[in-house]
Amino acid sequence: VRGEVTIDLTGVMAEEIGAAHGLSEADLRRIEPDLVRVASEIADLRRRGMLEVLDLPSVREDLDRIAEAAVKSHGFRNFVLLGIGGSSLGARAIFEACLSPFHNLAPEGERGAPRLFVAENVDPDSLDSLMRVAPPEETLYNVVSKSGTTVETISQLLVVWDRLASSVGKRAAEHLVITTDPERGFLRRLASELGIRSFGVPPGVGGRFSVLTPVGLYPAAVAGVDPLELLDGAAQMDERCRDNGWRQNPALALAGVHYAFDRLKGKGITVMMPYADSLRSFAEWFCQLWAESLGKRTNPAGDPRAPVGQTPVRALGAIDQHSQLQLYVDGPNDKLFSIVAVHRHRAEVRIPETTLPGVREEGLGHIPGHGLDELLSAERSATEMVLLGSERPVLVVDLPEVSAFSLGQMFYLYEWATIAAGMLYHVNPFDQPGVEEGKLLTHAAMGRSGSEKLAERIRSHRQRPDRHRIR
């Protein structure tokens, strides 16, 4: 068995932090029937082919085409992913976890891949600056949208296409790779009519669950990250998640602990705090997954219910010890903490002995001779201890190292846990009704035909009296 991601629940138990804020054996017995039910439901849905996302680790059909397309990408100086939300966060997490943070600054002969950029927002300053740094004529664009109609991504594409048409003319289509629905939507039509290379997103896999499809696997391959390693890591986690017992199934345990702390202990906020810069974007990916899947006020049938959901927050160790930790230790005890520990780093950097004056006199003489990894580990342990000492529940997710294989495990672990949590809350983890109205209003504001009533609502909103403005 290759290096496994494990979860340590010691710091969430009542015996560690007290019965008021920790889980007791009685609490665990209280939720155990629900966990058994959820595990059985997931297994049954998988047998009936209704949870396509959990079968993705065994889907390998696209890998040869992905590898071929990745080789062709190396004819470009730059690779830009146009996408937002689930269409971008997974790829960004892969880039950040598996490559040097300064990949784009490395000499061209040492990179082994194009310079990599992710264009998510429609801030005009950002896109304009990106096109100046990465001119379209030197760039391959991966346009990613499950629906094929995402307004932000399509708007970016229209800007980029205009620049490409001006700079490379009839070869503009060669600068695009599309990832979208296999049969429908504007992007699928565009790919078919212009002969643009494309990949399909499985119809049963929603955008925020799509990182183990070509949405994440193609950008990974372009970056020189082996998609097979991501899938193999996910497959190993899949095997571990087939057990119906929460003490053996890490994703079921993760879902159960989060649910129990929210419903039984009033912890409506969950903080993910990795102690590795390379996992910063993974934490952002998790935040979208958890928030958009679980924050609901309807049941799976679409009927109204009391609102539920746990607010995810990203922190980064050791940086946020110097910004957020004060609140976490002395502020309201309404949070569950997930500290992500990495036990082997790719680089070894020793703190050397020094002749700088005052080091020993100022009480810093104990620092030389240690590694930066030792310091980061010491800071992580200190944070755990301070939180536990203030009766804050802390679970620890342990990674042997940050690699494509361990990242594949993490993606699958949290996707499975999110689906299970949705079932515990009795909500549909795959829809997002709360964001649909905003999409309609956005299109109306931009002049979509047939949206005149919505457009009038927007005009009324913008023209409302501002008597409470502070000038």
What are these regions (language model features)?
Residues 114, 197-204, 309, 364-368, ...:
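Short beta-alpha connecting loops at secondary-structure transitions
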